[in-house]
C-alpha cells in the first residue's frame, strides 16, 4: 500500500510553526539561527510551540552552533542537556547529527545522545551531506535506531541530489529518507516520483516588512555581515498548501495505479493488506 506523503516545515520561529500548522503541515522542525543552517531554539520557543501545536508534530533541532559537525566535549554536554530539555517540554522528536574529523558518523557520541532521547523520534540532519561515504553512513545511522535522514543527496539542492536520494531509498527500506534543501511546490512532485520518497522538508518562507517606523540605516546588528534589519522571513501558508496540493495529486495517481494493479493481480491476501495497514500506522507514530 502506498504511503501518504508528508511535509515537514523548517520553522524559524514559533510564528512560522503556527502558520505551518494552519497550512496543514504534518510536522515542523523548530530552529533558530537559520542563516547558520539552524541552531537549537530557546527553552521559551520550544515551550510556546508545544502549547500551540496541537495538530502538527514538533521536532526540535539540537545544534549548539553553526559550522561543522565536529563537536567539542563542552558542546557535546550542551547537546545532551538540550535533548533532555526538549523531551521534558514535550517535543515529539529531535534532530541532530555528529561527525568525526574524517567525515564519518561519530557513532559513540551519537549513541550517547540517543540514550537521552527516550520515546522521541530522531532525525539525522544534513550532517549526512558532509559524510565521506554516504552509504556506509546510512548503515551506521540505521544501526543507531534513528527514524529518518534529512538530506539533499549530498548536492546543493535536493533536486540536483535525486540520483543519490534514489539510491539511498533503494538501498534499504529500514529508514525514512527525507529530501530537503531547495524543495518547493515547483519540484516536490518530481522529487517524489523520481526518488520514491514520501516525506519532504522545506521552509516555504516569504519576507514580511518590519513594522518599525524609525529606521537607522547606518547601523546593522550583524556587524560586517549584512543582514536585512527590517525584513522578517515567515512560513507562507500558501506555499505550504501549494506543495501539499502537488503531493495530493501524486498520491491520488499512486492510489489509482495501485487499484488498477490489484484488479489485474487480485491474488494478494487479506493478511498482506493488514500488514500494509500496520506499516502505515507505524509511520504515523514517527
Language-model segment annotations:
Residues 21-28, 53-55, 90-93, 116-119, ...:
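Glycine-enriched alpha-helix->loop->beta-strand junction motifs that scaffold or abut catalytic
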Residues 47-85:
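Structural motif corresponding to the early beta-alpha repeats
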Residues 173-255:
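C-terminal alpha-helical cap/extension of soluble enzyme domains
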Residues 27-39, 85, 89-101, 146-161, ...:
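Glycine-rich phosphate-binding active-site loops on the catalytic face of alpha/beta enzymes
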Residues 5-9, 28-30, 58-62, 94-96, ...:
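Hydrophobic faces of well-ordered beta-strands that scaffold small-molecule active sites
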Residues 15, 34-54, 74-76, 99-118, ...:
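Active-site-adjacent beta->alpha loops and helix N-cap segments on the catalytic face
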Residues 2-13, 62-78, 123-134:
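Active-site mouth loops of central-metabolism enzymes
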Residues 12-19, 70-82, 132-144, 168, ...:
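Catalytic cores of alpha/beta
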Amino acid at each position: 500500500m502506498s504511503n501518504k506523503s508528508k511535509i515537514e516545515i523548517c520553522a524559524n520561529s514559533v510564528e512560522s510553526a503556527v502558520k505551518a500548522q494552519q497550512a496543514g503541515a504534518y510536522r515542523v522542525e523548530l530552529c533558530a539561527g537559520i542563516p547558520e543552517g539552524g541552531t537549537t531554539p530557546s527553552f521559551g520557543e520550544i515551550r510556546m510551540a508545544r502549547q500551540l501545536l496541537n495538530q502538527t508534530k514538533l521536532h526540535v533541532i539540537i545544534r549548539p552552533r553553526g559550522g561543522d559537525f565536529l563537536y567539542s566535549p563542552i558542546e557535546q554536554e550542551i547537546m545532551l542537556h538540550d535533548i533532555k530539555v526538549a523531551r521534558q517540554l514535550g517535543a515529539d522528536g529531535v534532530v541532530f547529527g555528529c561527525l568525526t574529523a574524517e567525515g564519518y558518523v561519530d557513532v559513540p557520541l551519537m549513541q550517547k545522545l540517543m540514550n537521552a532521547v527516550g520515546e522521541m523520534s530522531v532525525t539525522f540532519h544534513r550532517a549526512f551531506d558532509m559524510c565521506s561515504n554516504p552509504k556506509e553512513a546510512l548503515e551506521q545511522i540505521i544501526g543507531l535506531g534513528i527514524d529518518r535522514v534529512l538530506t539533499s543527496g549530498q548536492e546543493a539542492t535536493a533536486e540536483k541530489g535525486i540520483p543519490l536520494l534514489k539510491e539511498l531509498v533503494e538501498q534499504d527500506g529500514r529508514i525514512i529518507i527525507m529530501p530537503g534543501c531547495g524543495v518547493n511546490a515547483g519540484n516536490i512532485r518530481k522529487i517524489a516520483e523520481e526518488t520514491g520518497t514520501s516525506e519532504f522538508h522545506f521552509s516555504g518562507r516569504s519576507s514580511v516588512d518590519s513594522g518599525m517606523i524609525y529606521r537607522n540605516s547606518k547601523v546593522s546588528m550583524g556587524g560586517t555581515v549584512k543582514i536585512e534589519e527590517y525584513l522578517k522571513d515567515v512560513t507562507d501558508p500558501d506555499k505550504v498548501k501549494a506543495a501539499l496540493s502537488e503531493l495530493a495529486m501524486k498520491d491520488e495517481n499512486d492510489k489509482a495505479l495501485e487499484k488498477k494493479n490489484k484488479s489485474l493481480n487480485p491474488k494478494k491476501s487479506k493478511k498482506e493488506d493488514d500488514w500494509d495497514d500496520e506499516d502505515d500506522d507505524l509511520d504515523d507514530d514517527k
